[in-house]
Regions:
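Long extracytoplasmic/lumenal interhelical loops at the membrane interface
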Residues: 257-268, 280-317, 340
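Transmembrane signal-anchor hairpin modules in multi-pass inner-membrane enzymes, especially those
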Residues: 1-81, 101-107, 111, 176-183, ...
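A conserved mid-to-late transmembrane alpha helix and its immediate loop/hinge
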Residues: 195-197, 271, 277-280, 301-336, ...
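Alpha-helical transmembrane segments of multi-pass inner-membrane proteins
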Residues: 12, 16-17, 107-144, 151-221, ...
Length: 403
């Protein structure tokens, strides 16, 4: 019975890897199923389902500080529900990180995730040229002669953010030298297709994160190819921009303050809110209420959050909330880099660790210009990347050292 449950758990994990790129409801259902089966299996074994890791201390501190913002809320229940709308995912991480997956199944899961992202990329590129969303049966937003790709999601930002993180995994796998040339070329082709889908999304924040992923990966694995691969990326980007002038206009708008007025106004408004509420913040789900009080004069075509995850954390949870959130990710990077250095050169889990490092590095850069952590589609994939890395750290670094 227990062996059958373990097999079912693995299949649900693989299914989760596939559905992550296609459905918010699906990814939540599969995540819930993985958690439920994990608890059932450990109940059969009469074992503790969570394996210790020091990262949990940093995550727990972040949660405690975030909860402190409830002290100033006029409606504690509503604020708590709004907070848990995204941060419930973090509560599953100790269980996900403790999954006893073999390296083989972990790698298969990542391969399925990359394949799923490639299919989502092809669909997004189709949307870019046709403006058709076959899944939701709607017309897409038009920019010049082309359209914003949204994949299977409702937002181009959600689509771009998740494609960005999976691209990092495919790119890391390509950089890993201990595999055949055919396998490496397959990963490179996958990364290239996903790259085109990010371009098709017209998400400028994700565009800005791409060179960070490329350069950081090369600095980590093969500095000799830094100029060659970086130059190839520049040529590819220039080719896309030259042959599709509408994308050139979109790219140049990054540097035009007049075309970023809403974002700049939201940043200034957020700074004013933080100045008056630096310790506890304003609480989750209240940004629009305070926007009406603190808004600086000017044009706004969006609201709801600060259009910057760092500013948004400081607004919602105060400066202590921002500090503990950043500290949590610094701690995660520390444990991942430590694991990457300790694992043998030929260990395939090294490329998974590198992929998760590049993925979260990329999304943290993109988060300087947009709120991705508050988007549940992105939040789940973000924590998926973190949990996979922690899983390897627990299995191969932390617990062996403790024993």
């Amino acid at each position: 019975m227990e062996n059958r449950l373990n097999q079912i758990l693995v299949y649900f994990f693989l299914g989760w890897c596939i559905i992550l790129m296609w459905s918010l409801a699906g990814m939540q259902i599969m995540l819930g199923s993985v958690i439920f089966l994990t608890l059932v299996i450990h109940l059969f074994r009469k074992e503790q389902p969570v394996k210790d890791h020091p990262f949990y201390l940093f995550a727990g501190l972040y949660i405690l500080v975030s909860l402190s913002s409830l002290l100033r809320s006029r409606d504690i229940g509503q604020t708590l529900l709004s907070m848990l709308n995204n941060d419930w995912v973090i509560l599953t991480i100790p269980l996900l990180a403790s999954l006893n997956l073999s390296p083989r199944w972990r790698q298969r899961g990542l391969n399925l995730l990359i394949l799923s992202a490639v299919l989502a990329a092809i669909y997004g590129i189709f949307q870019f040229f046709t403006g058709s969303d076959l899944i939701r049966n709607r017309a897409l937003g038009q920019f010049g002669s082309y359209y914003r790709a949204v994949g299977a999601y409702g937002s181009f930002l959600s689509y771009a953010g998740n494609q960005l993180m999976v691209l990092a995994c495919a790119y890391a796998a390509f950089l890993f030298p201990a595999q055949s040339r055919t396998v490496r070329i397959s990963y490179l082709a996958a990364a290239g297709i996903i790259f085109l889908s990010i371009i098709a999304s017209q998400s400028r924040s994700s565009w800005l994160a791409l060179p960070v992923i490329v350069i950081l990966g090369l600095l980590t694995v093969n500095r000799k190819q830094l100029i060659y691969i970086s130059g190839s990326l520049v040529i590819l980007v220039l080719a896309v921009v030259i042959f599709i002038p509408d994308l050139q206009s979109r790219f140049m708008s990054i540097f035009n303050f007049a075309q970023n007025e809403t974002r700049l106004n939201l940043w200034r408004t957020s700074a004013a809110i933080i100045s008056d509420h630096p310790v506890l913040g304003i609480g989750s789900g209240t940004f629009n209420d305070y926007l009406e009080i603190y808004r600086v004069p000017g044009f706004y075509d969006a609201r709801g959050h600060a259009h910057n995850d760092y500013l948004n954390k400081a607004v919602i949870n105060g400066l202590p909330g921002l500090i503990t959130w950043i500290g949590m990710w610094i701690a995660w990077f520390y444990y991942m880099v430590r694991a990457y250095k300790i694992l043998p050169q030929q260990d395939e889990d090294r490329k998974i660790i590198l992929g998760s490092i590049l993925a979260i590095s990329g999304i943290l850069v993109a988060a300087l210009f947009q709120c991705y952590y508050t988007d549940l589609e992105n939040n789940i994939v973000w924590w998926f990347m973190a949990a996979i890395g922690l899983q390897i750290s627990i299995q191969k670094v932390y617990r062996p050292a403790a024993e």
